[in-house]
């Protein structure tokens, strides 16, 4: 027996989300069916608002409603340091720590030869232009994940940035291999930032 078309389309839509297979998508679709009209309307409005109201900061690449984002606009932050992360949600993890007060740059991915992702496919060019335009930046802290692709990206960044005389450091390896920054607790992140090593 096939599901009615609206349910089948909703299942297909949920399956486009990362980590959601057919069983989970079916469960979510039927849960949605049982929600009140008001809750479904609010859910739909939230989805539309994310696409309509959010965009990438023209300076750092973080998700924001304003341009530049609140972090880039905050002149009380340490303007001499830029912490480079893979995704916007990594910034949220670092900010929860409340110990890093510098700036950020979001790559929106990593260099991954196995996935066919090269330097031109990530937000790298804007980082290089930013470093060239803002001579007050003295240190780039590379906070890509401790995976093969994260390490490849970190080495590539160091290779590009060090010749400009900017200090390049890497988070200490208190992070386990393959660990995602956004799933790491604040104490471990704090130790990783404090114990960063020069590349």
Swiss-Prot record:
CDD domains: TOPRIM_recR. A zinc finger (C4-type) spans 57-72. The keyword Protein transport does not apply. InterPro entries: DNA_Rcmb_RecR (IPR000093), Rcmb_RecR (IPR023627), Rcmb_RecR_Znf (IPR015967), TOPRIM_dom (IPR006171), TOPRIM_RecR (IPR034137). Gene3D superfamilies: 3.30.60.80, 3.40.1360.10, 6.10.250.240, RecR Domain 1. SMART domains: TOPRIM. GO terms for biological process: DNA recombination; DNA repair. Residues 80-176 form the Toprim domain. SUPFAM superfamilies: Recombination protein RecR. Keywords: DNA damage, DNA recombination, DNA repair, Metal-binding, Zinc, Zinc-finger. Signal peptide: none annotated. One of its GO terms (molecular function) is DNA binding. May play a role in DNA repair. It seems to be involved in an RecBC-independent recombinational process of DNA repair. It may act with RecF and RecO. Belongs to the RecR family. This is Recombination protein RecR. It comes from Limosilactobacillus fermentum (strain NBRC 3956 / LMG 18251) (Lactobacillus fermentum). The lineage of its organism: Bacteria, Bacillati, Bacillota, Bacilli, Lactobacillales.
